[in-house]
C-alpha cells in the first residue's frame, strides 16, 4: 500500500528517489516518487532512466510554472487517497559545506531555499524534508519560516541520521 507520494526537487540521477521507492513495510512498497524537478537536462535524463514512472521537469525551481505539477499531484492523491504528500528538497550545498572550507562560494544559490515556500503554499504537502549540510542552518531563521509557512500545522524537527545508503555519515 502506497503511504507516501514524493516530489523530489533537485532530483539528480535519482539516488534519493531510489531509496524512497525501496522503502518497504511487511514486504510492500510504501512510497512512490511521482514528480521530479532539476534544471540539468542530464540529471533529468538519468533520473528518468532510473524512474520512468515519475513526471519529470527540466526546469529551474525558481521559475517552474506549478500548474502541471499541481494537476499531477491531484491525480496522484485521487489514485492513492490514503497517501501523504512529501516535498523532498536536496538543495545545493557544495558551496557551503566545510568541505570547501566553510566559506560561501555562491551566495545566489542560498536563495533556492526561499523558493521552497512557493511549493509549500501551492502543494500543501503533508511533510517537508530538506537534506543539506549542517551549515545550512546558519543561513538565517529558516526553521521559524518553515513553521510559519505551514500555518501552524507543522513543526521543525531536525533528524540526525548516523548512516544512510553507502555508509555515508549524515546529520
Please give the residue ranges for each predicted region.
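Conserved active-site and SAM-binding loop architecture
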Residues: 1-171
Amino acid at each position: 500500500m502506497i503511504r507516501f507520494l514524493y516530489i523530489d526537487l533537485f532530483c539528480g540521477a535519482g539516488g534519493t528517489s531510489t531509496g524512497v521507492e525501496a522503502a518497504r513495510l511487511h514486504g510492500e512498497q510504501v512510497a512512490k516518487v511521482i514528480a521530479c524537478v532539476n534544471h540539468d537536462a542530464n540529471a533529468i535524463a538519468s533520473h528518468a532512466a532510473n524512474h520512468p514512472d515519475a513526471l519529470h521537469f527540466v526546469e529551474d525551481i525558481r521559475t517552474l510554472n506549478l500548474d502541471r505539477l499541481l494537476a499531477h499531484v491531484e491525480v496522484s492523491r485521487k489514485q492513492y487517497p490514503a497517501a501523504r504528500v512529501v516535498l523532498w528538497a536536496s538543495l545545493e550545498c557544495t558551496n557551503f559545506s566545510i568541505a570547501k572550507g566553510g566559506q560561501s562560494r555562491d551566495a545566489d544559490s542560498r536563495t533556492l531555499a526561499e523558493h521552497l515556500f512557493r511549493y509549500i503554499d501551492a502543494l500543501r504537502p503533508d511533510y517537508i524534508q530538506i537534506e543539506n549540510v549542517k551549515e545550512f542552518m546558519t543561513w538565517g531563521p529558516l526553521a521559524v519560516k518553515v513553521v510559519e509557512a505551514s500555518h501552524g500545522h507543522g513543526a521543525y524537527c531536525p533528524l540526525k541520521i548516523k548512516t544512510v545508503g553507502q555508509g555515508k555519515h549524515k546529520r
